[in-house]
Amino acid sequence: MGVGGSRLDNVSAGGLACPILPDGRLKERAMNIRSQWMTRHPDGAVFADIKIPSYDKVLAAVDRAHRAVPHFRIVGWDFCIDEHGDPVFIEYNGAPAMNQVSCGPLFGDLTEPVLNTIFLNEAEFTN
C-alpha cells in the first residue's frame, strides 16, 4: 500500500506490504523495504482494524483474470477498489517478489508439490 499520498504501492517504492486474511481483513503488522514491522500505517490507520471492501469481488476478478493468462502458473495480481466498491485491475506480475518476507511461506504444506510443478524437471531434458 502507498504511503504519504503516493499512488505507488510497491515496497521498493516506499510502500508497505501487509498480509491479507482469507476474509479480507489485514493482519496486524505490515513491513517496509527495510523489513521493519509496524502495526499502524504512517497516516495513522491501524492495520488490524482494516477490512478490504468488496474483497469477494476482488477474489472473483483475480480468478477470472488468472484463467485468461494460462501461460503463467504464479502471478502477483494488483487490484484497487474504486469509489463504488468495484475492483479495478492495475497490473499483473509474472515474477512476484517479497510475498514470503511479509506473509510467510506462500504455499505452506503444498510448497514441494508446487515447486515440482513450477520448475522444469531437469531429468526430462538430459535423457
Task: List the predicted regions and their residue ranges.
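ATP-dependent carboxylate/phosphate-activation module, predominantly the ATP-grasp catalytic core
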Residues: 1-60
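C-terminal active-site "lid" helix and adjoining low-complexity regulatory extension at the edge
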Residues: 39-60, 67-72, 81-127
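Hydrophobic residue at the +6 position relative to the catalytic HRD Asp in the kinase catalytic loop
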Residues: 77-79
